[in-house]
Design a protein with these regions (language model features):
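Conserved GNAT acetyl-CoA-binding A-motif
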Residues: 109-121
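Conserved acetyl-CoA-binding loop-helix of GNAT-fold acetyltransferases
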Residues: 88, 94-107, 134
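C-terminal "cap" of GNAT-fold acetyltransferases
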Residues: 145-191
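Acetyl-CoA-dependent GNAT
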Residues: 23-78, 84, 89
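A short, internal acetyl-CoA/4′-phosphopantetheine-binding micro-motif in the GNAT/acyltransferase core
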Residues: 83-94, 121-122
Length: 191
């Protein structure tokens, strides 16, 4: 029986089970040469990474089959959340688990009064890109982070409508300009 649980500063958070899930879920990415740091996280790194955020965890009976983290941030008086560590057990993929977790993620985002959600994924993580587009995220930047050996798409999902975001972030020319600049002047490892 599938169920979704949300953890926030809880001693019951199943960190070890989530660590095992991340390792399993990102094995295919590692084989493709996409080295997600989450795939090798320890329990302590998981705890530290999310800090005061939320883990949304999917269970099939007592087995952890999916997870995603919501991390709250604020900059210039704007509250936003990051959508991180999305993972589904490979044997459970394409069963709607990520979509169910995202519905819970949105509920939590509304509860914590966030303005928008930001997420990133590797340029070649095709299933992740499909997931983001299917769930209403809009591509707004193409970047190369110093901490990753690959190019990344940045996605945004608005919770509240902002004129500034509507006209600057969702503007296709902004994405195209960032794509061209990154491909011309940046290496995949931001070098």
């Amino acid at each position: 029986m599938l169920r979704i649980e949300t953890y926030h500063n809880s001693p019951d958070t199943p960190y070890e089970k989530m660590r095992i899930l991340l390792n399993s879920a990102f094995q295919e990415r590692k084989e493709e040469g996409i080295d997600f740091a989450y795939a090798t996280y320890t329990v302590e790194q998981l705890k530290e990474h999310v800090g005061n955020g939320f883990y949304i965890v999917a269970y099939d009976n007592d087995t952890v089959v999916g997870m995603v983290a919501l991390i709250q941030k604020e900059r210039y008086g704007i509250r936003y959340s990051t959508h991180e560590c999305l993972a589904v057990l490979p044997s459970m993929s394409n069963k709607g688990i990520a979509t169910l977790m995202f519905q819970t993620f949105l509920e939590v985002a509304h509860q914590v009064d966030t303005d928008f959600i930001i997420s990133t994924t590797a340029e070649k993580a095709y299933s992740s890109i499909r997931y983001h587009k299917k769930n209403g995220f809009k591509t707004f930047l193409f970047v190369s982070f110093p901490s990753t050996p690959y190019y990344s798409y940045c996605f945004i999902y608005p919770i509240r409508k902002f004129k500034l975001l509507k006209y600057s972030v969702f503007n296709k020319p902004v994405f195209v300009a960032s794509y061209v600049f990154t491909k011309l002047f940046k290496k995949e490892n931001n070098g």
